[in-house]
Each structure stands twice: as structure tokens, then as C-alpha cells.
Amino acid sequence: MCGFSRRFDESYRAAYKKVENGLIGRPSVLRSQTCDKHDPSGFYVEYASWSGGVFVDMAVHDIDLTLWFFGSDIIPKSISAYGLTAVTPDLKKHNDFDNAVGIVEFWNGKIAYYYCSRMMAHGQEDVTEIIGTEGKLSVNLNPADNLVNYYHAGGITREVPATYWGRFEQAFVRETQEFVDACLDDTPLPMKLGNAVKAVQIGAWLQEALVSGKQLKFDETGRRVEASKI
């Protein structure tokens, strides 16, 4: 079992059930982001020295969602990525970025778009849209920490979670419960380890495309058309 917390989130599970029931037709495009609140302390610079890069560290959760909603058998056709250091230029010494966009085209006619950021001013903003041939689903499109809106002379204020933990706290609890159930009662796990490995592999390819500035291409078996450049 691997700790992809979004698979244990009630909203993502509800969205998956709707996809499974055919409510949006054939899922064709997935647009997903992991955006952290800006931390000016320099933590992310030190962290980048061993994290594997923004796509391996952050987008891996969005990639796992892609394998969940599109099917774990999907094969990349091309991978492109672009990034910048808008607020933390010291990340460059680790070949990392505080904002990055990645696009993965799959051989079965599906596309995934990922956005990662470490400079959100307001708080944690993790959003996903699954666009199908007959409809669309969104998860957390309007982030909120709770159901309270504060109405005042300047407008309406709604708080959002400050951290990843704040957004997925209950998912972490459920994940622990299901892991314990699997250990004690031999209940089925909600994912296979091979899917986790595949998510990390795609994340590593995105990071390679980001650092090299090159588009990566694959044949229909998933084999690289050309060798790695980094």
C-alpha cells in the first residue's frame, strides 16, 4: 500500500463513483493541481535537494488520480513540461521550480494537465477537473476550510486550509483505518503497488522534461523513443 491520500478523500471517491457509473461519459481530459502556500523561510530550497523535484514530490498525487480515473493501463505518448522560479530563485541550484506545468498525452486519446505551485498567497489549493464526453466533474474548485462565510464591508471572506494536512486530514485518518483493517482482517487494499510505481515513473519523466526542456516521446508499448538526456 502507498500513501496517496486523495484516494481516501470522500470527495474524490464520490467523483470516481460518478465516473464509474458513466455520468460524464468517457473521461477524456484530466486537469489537476497541487498548490502549496508560499513559505518564505527557505524550507523548500533545502527540501528540493532530495525531494526529486516538483513533479515527483507534488504532481505525483495528481498523476495517481489520472491512473485512477483513466485506468492504470494507460500508456504515455508524449510528455512536456515548463517551469519558472517566481518567488524562490534559489531553487534553480537544485534544478527545481516553484511553478511548473506538465502535459501528458496518452495513446488512448486522453490528456492530463498538471500544475504545481509553491507560491499560493492564500493557502492550500488542490483542485481537480475530470472532463468527459457527456459532462464534467470538479473537486474542490472553490476551496474552503469550512462552511463559514464572513460578510463584511470589504466583501465576503471564506477561509481555506493553510496546509496539505488541513485539506486532507480526514483522508489521512481513513487511510490509516483501512491499512489497519487490511493488516488485521485481510480486507482488500484500494490500490496496487504497481500503480504507485507507475505514478512515480511518470513524475520522473515530467521532471526530466522540465529540466531538459525537451518533449519526451514513447511508442505504443510505453518504450522511450529516445534515451534520457539527464
Indicate where each model-derived feature is located.
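Glycine-/small-residue-rich active-site loops that bind phosphorylated ligands and cofactors
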Residues: 7, 119, 198
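Predominantly a Rossmann-like dinucleotide-binding segment in NAD(P)-dependent oxidoreductases
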Residues: 1, 6-94, 213
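Short arginine-rich
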Residues: 202-212
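Short, hydrophobic secondary-structure boundary micro-motifs
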Residues: 27, 79, 160, 190-192, ...
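Contiguous beta-strand/loop segments that form the cofactor/metal-binding neighborhood of enzyme cores
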Residues: 64-145, 173-189, 204-206, 219-230
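Glycine- and charged-residue-rich phosphate/anionic-cofactor binding loop of Rossmann-like
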Residues: 2, 160-164, 182-199
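A generic short alpha-helical patch detector that favors 3-5-residue windows
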Residues: 167-171
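Mobile, glycine-enriched helix-loop/loop "lid" segments at the mouths of ligand-binding/catalytic clefts
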Residues: 31-33, 136-157
